[in-house]
UniProtKB/Swiss-Prot annotation:
InterPro entries, A to Z: DDH_dom, DHH_sf, DHHA1_dom, RecJ_exonuclease, SSDNA_exonuclease_RecJ
Name this protein carries in UniProt: Single-stranded-DNA-specific exonuclease RecJ
Organism (species): Methanocaldococcus jannaschii (strain ATCC 43067 / DSM 2661 / JAL-1 / JCM 10045 / NBRC 100440)
Record's keyword annotation contains Nuclease: yes
Signal peptide limits: none
GO biological process: DNA recombination
Protein keywords: Exonuclease, Hydrolase, Nuclease
Family: Belongs to the RecJ family.
Recorded name of the encoding gene: recJ
EC number in record: 3.1.-.-
Highest classification ranks of the organism: Archaea, Methanobacteriati, Methanobacteriota, Methanomada group, Methanococci
A GO term, aspect molecular function: nucleic acid binding
Nuclease is among the record's keywords: yes
Length: 469
């Protein structure tokens, strides 16, 4: 990234602070954890005097937990761009506004529109006319590390995992800056790229289970194991092949998966509007990414499954387990991660049953929503996405889930990938507009985002209707 001035400047400032006290603050999702892994490796290699801190988000409350005065340099990764004004005001309040290059922000989220003060080095792809959808926070952290030492391509694998965890392969493959980072990870022998069916659980689930939960197009196969098995048997008969529905996707020959994909494409044509049909192939086939160094059949081999394992820890505050597994532990912490994963899946199952049996899905013209105080706010977004498997949920509309949080309400929004492709729905823009109208804050991605609102649920819904017209 020869022309990325702020990236070069940030790398130089870090090297100038090698003997000073440094604090590195990262977000808590897969992108945040992989950013932390990259920056922790960087700190070890440069022998920095660095402390680390995880932060769920920067708010008026949590910014007071950041010890700005105790450190010469503070680095934020996968957060900070959306809170530039708040960070600037806190530095002013603490009489630190004369400290040049006090803060480095490594982020990819939409920045606040303010004049960047001399105290902050803001490294974000959007400032160089790149998209925040083609590189994640870990990707920016990786390029930052590479600006210090161009040979550190062994760190690229973390950035690829961060990108997959942030669903930046939504178009069926990683693009733009992510593609260049992926090439580094491939060159270093860490990541393998394949074309495969876009179904979750390639390494760990039987084929029929992966098909059971595939909801990018709602067909008669969803949640119907007997129908899925009969469907596979009919494919076997039609093509004179033998696909075992209990085999994992990773075990099935590509030629057989290509046949399944083609048959699924034909089936899906009966379930979508005509103008959606050109986009169906993108949700059936695409690139998948594996870590070569992980065992075949391990939930850590497929990067989507690895990301779920991280979420099963970090969403419940167990950052230590996720980080240690990322850094290479396959003993004590890996066993703890698998235990966390079982609990996480059980929580999701119970929450989905609650939505199915006890919650009213309220339909609006352009979206739908539900309210509950029975689902943990840390998983409500995942549950919102999973709710498309429920018959009462209209799979052709976005869904918003509203649950109580410490200081008001958390709102999580999801929509099917096809809706983003065919109708150009942008939930992030809508939720940001509606939340700010009621003195809250929100943002994220076109297809998955969230917000915090103090109260005014009814007003928030009203502004959502305006935003999604």
């Amino acid at each position: 990234m020869e022309n990325w001035v702020e990236l070069k400047k940030g790398a130089k400032v870090l090297q100038n602070n090698k003997n000073n006290k440094i604090l590195i603050v990262t977000h808590i999702d897969t992108d945040g954890l992989t950013s932390r892994a990259i920056l922790q490796k960087l700190a070890e290699r440069l022998n920095l005097d660095a402390d680390f801190m995880f932060l769920k988000q920067i708010t008026i409350e949590t910014i007071n937990d950041i010890p700005f005065k105790d450190y010469d340099l503070i680095i934020f990764a996968d957060l900070g761009s959306g809170q530039l004004k708040m960070i600037k005001e806190k530095l002013d309040e603490l009489n630190l506004s004369d400290k040049r290059d006090k803060i480095i922000i490594l982020d990819h989220h939409q920045p606040e529109e303010i004049k960047i003060p001399k105290t902050i080095i803001h490294i974000n792809p959007l400032t160089i006319a790149k998209s925040g959808a083609e590189i994640c926070g870990a990707g920016v952290s990786y390029l930052f590390a590479k600006a210090i030492n161009n040979d550190w391509i062994d760190l690229a694998k973390y950035a690829v995992l961060g990108a997959v965890g942030d669903i930046q392969n939504i178009e069926g493959k990683l693009i733009g800056l992510n593609r260049k980072i992926l090439c580094d990870a491939i060159m270093n022998g860490d990541v393998k790229v394949k074309t495969d069916l876009q179904m979750y659980g390639r390494q760990t689930r039987p084929l029929f289970v992966s098909m059971r939960y595939w909801a990018d197009v709602r067909t008669d196969l969803l949640n119907n194991d007997s129908k899925i098995i009969k469907y596979i048997q009919s494919i076997n008969k039609k093509y004179d092949i033998e696909i075992n529905p209990t085999m994992r996707l990773a075990e099935i020959p590509f030629e057989h998966k290509r046949i399944i994909g083609n048959e699924l494409l034909i089936k899906c044509l009966n379930y979508v509007p005509n103008h959606w049909t050109p986009y169906i192939p993108k949700v059936i086939f695409g690139e998948v990414y594996e870590f070569r160094g992980e065992e075949f059949g391990s939930p850590l081999r497929d990067l989507e499954e690895f990301s779920t394992c991280i979420n099963a820890c970090s969403r419940y505050g167990d950052y230590e387990t996720a980080l240690n597994v990322l850094m290479g532990d396959r003993d004590k912490y890996y066993r703890k991660m698998l235990s966390n994963l079982r609990k996480h899946r059980n929580n999701l199952r119970e929450a989905l049953e609650h939505v199915k049996n006890d919650v009213e899905i309220i339909q609006k013209d352009r979206f739908q929503y539900f309210e509950t105080d029975k689902i943990m706010s840390n998983i409500v977004g995942i549950v919102a996405g999973m709710s498309y498997s429920i018959e009462e949920v209209d799979w052709m509309k976005p869904i918003f889930a509203i649950t109580e949080d410490e200081n008001g309400y958390k709102v999580s929004a999801r929509c099917p990938k096809l809706l983003c492709f065919a109708e150009d729905v942008n939930l992030a823009k809508a939720i940001k507009y509606a939340s700010e109208k009621v003195n809250g804050s929100g943002g994220g991605h076109k297809f998955a985002c969230g917000a915090y609102i103090p109260d005014n649920k009814r007003e928030f819904i009203k502004y959502l209707e305006i935003a999604l017209r």
